[in-house]
Amino acid sequence: VKTVTIAESINIMSKTIGPAMKEKNAKPIQEMAVAEAEAGADFLDVNIGPARKGGDEMMEWLVKTIHEVVALPLSLDTTNPVAMEAGLKAHKKGGQPLVNSVSCQADRIDAGLELVKKYGAQMVGLLWGTEGMPRDVNERAALAVDLVYKANEKGIPSQDIFIDPIATPVKGEINQVIACTEFMGMLKDLAPGCKSVVGLSNVSNGTPDKLRPFLNRAYLLMLYQQGLYSAIVDAYDKELMALCRGEHPELVELVSKVMAGGEVESKALPTQQQHYLKTVRVLMGKSLYSDSWLEI
C-alpha cells in the first residue's frame, strides 16, 4: 500500500531555486525536477508563493521548463489566480495538474473552483475558512462538507478533490495536531470518494533541522493509519520515501499498535523503533514536546 507523493523542493523560498526562478535559470530547476522524479515522486509541487509581479510569466516558464525534462503532473502552488491559470494553460504532460490550492474563504472559493473546472484539473481543497484556521475537528468537518458540496455543484467530481486539513507545528498547539489526525480518520465518511493530502513538513516546522525527519516520518505513518491518500514530502528523505512506497511493515505495525493504545515496552525495541515510538507519543499528545524528546 502506497502513499502518493508530491515533492516539495521546487519552491521560491529555497536559497538555490528562488534565485533561479527569478533569473529564469533553467538548470538548477531541471536538475531538481529530475532528482525528485528519480526519488519516486508522483507529482512535483511548483511553489511560487503570491508572486504578485509577473507571476503568470514565471509559472508558465516553470511548467514548460520542468516538462522539458520530466513528464510528471505538477502541483501548481500559488495564491495568485492569474499565475495559476497561466500554469494550467501550459500544463500539457503527465495527465491532470493539481491546483494547490482552493481555500474555503468566501471571496476566493468560486474563482478557484472555476479554474479547476475550466481546465479539468484536480484540486487541493484547503480547509482554511473566512475566519482563518479551523479550531478543531468539527470546524474542519463543516468546511470540508461545504467545500465538496460547492465543488460537486460546479461539476468537479469528488475523486479530483484532495482535502487538506492543515497540519500545524507540533511546537505550537498540540490539540491542532491531534485534530488533524482525528479528522483524517473521519474524512471517508464525511466526503466519500474524496482524496486527502497533508503538508508533512508543517508538523516539524520550528524544530531543529536534524530532528525534523523523525517527526515527518512518524506523522506520515500515523496519518496512513487514518486513511491518508497523499502527502507533500521532502523527496530527498530516503526513509520517508521508502515508507510512502509501503516498505518497513514493522514500523507501520508499531505505529498502529501505539495509536490503538497498546502497551509497548520501548527498551525491548531496536533504536529506530524506539525513535518512532517516542515521536508518535509526542504527536499524540501523550508526551510533552521538547527538543530532546528522543533522548528522554
Model-found features: residue ranges?
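Active-site-proximal loop/turn and secondary-structure-junction residues that shape catalytic pockets
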Residues: 10-12, 48-52, 80-82, 103-105, ...
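Active-site mouth loops of central-metabolism enzymes
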Residues: 3-31, 55, 100-106, 130-138, ...
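Catalytic alpha/beta core domains of metabolic enzymes, predominantly
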Residues: 111, 118-266
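Catalytic beta/alpha-barrel core
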Residues: 45-51, 72-80, 96-107, 127, ...
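Glycine-rich, proline-tolerant flexible connector loops at the mouths of alpha/beta enzymes
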Residues: 37-72, 167-177
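Structural preference for beta-strand elements that scaffold enzyme active sites
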Residues: 3-5, 42-45, 73-75, 96-98, ...
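Extended, intrinsically disordered, low-complexity segments
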Residues: 1-19, 30-31, 235-296
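Distinct, well-ordered alpha-helical segments
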Residues: 55-63, 84-92, 112-115, 140, ...
